[in-house]
């Protein structure tokens, strides 16, 4: 049997178009998708228009069926170890958000440090996420709360269940109803997110900004959110499907270098139990280089948050909180000192949460409890509870 090259027809071009849409449902690199598409185009030339269109339709139907199966069976959830990544999405105004109007319960088997470093320390727990219509972790939409909490994954409560969030402790224990605008990012993201919130709700709220010692001290550049073009918005429809997310995760796992993050985990024994620390955050905590305003530019960032910004809170790394059991030498405090200086220049009050977290760590240790997850970089329910008490005390001074 000999193969003969067929002249391209309308059916051939339709087959190419349909097959390209089917391939976009797979989260593979562009180079791989293009290679497969070129191979299909070559095969279609020999198959003829009708056969090519039938094959393309079969590929599209198969992709749609796979997408349904992955969604219906929960396979997509199985590739994520916590809701933080599973529910992550993007918004043209706010940037990173969670999937809006979603409630999800997941058995989180381990934290981010165990995921990165495989240190053998695991604290499994149930994690419930509930999001509002904007895609932030609130039980209801914004309804005029006086305070809006802005910050990264610690403010958002990345590894914690909904009832343990700062906003929940503040509302239930201290009768201060606040709104959670937290999501992983840096100072650029906090400014953009706050401005987007102002566009929606005006200036009749006060911003409490949470700055994390571990990864928030990067330069503020005034970077705005790039507005996606028509092609990017179209491709985002594919990226939101279960099949794309599932295959993308499988690809990343297969291409991940073995042992790439194994050196990131520092395991120490505290209170008779193993606790893991992120070496990068340990290095940040031990930094003795003076941080300069002409490098980080936090002052214009704080100015950009006016007139809403009312208070800044400094969140220490887990290593700083537990340093008294690990290091015999006093730690430097360059991040706090810089933030204090920048806040003073911007005329915004700032408060350090380190002392209350350290005191609670001392109090809880004899009971075998901690204020940060032993397998994660984030604080746990104990940490957010004691932090909320201090936050409530400070915010009360800003209430009429």
Predicted regions and their residues:
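N-terminal secretory targeting modules
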Residues: 1-146, 204, 217-222, 226-227
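Structural motif
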Residues: 185-196
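Histidine-centered active-site loop/cap adjacent to the catalytic His
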Residues: 3-8, 371-400
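Short catalytic/ligand-binding loop motif for oxyanion handling, primarily in non-cytosolic enzymes
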Residues: 156-158, 187-189, 216-221, 319-324, ...
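A short beta-strand-loop structural module common to alpha/beta enzyme folds
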Residues: 176-187
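Serine-dependent acyl-ester chemistry module
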Residues: 16-20, 215-307, 314-337
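Substrate-gating cap/lid alpha-helix
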Residues: 52-58, 65, 318-354
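Membrane/wall-proximal cationic-aromatic binding patches
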Residues: 74-176, 192, 256-291, 296-303, ...
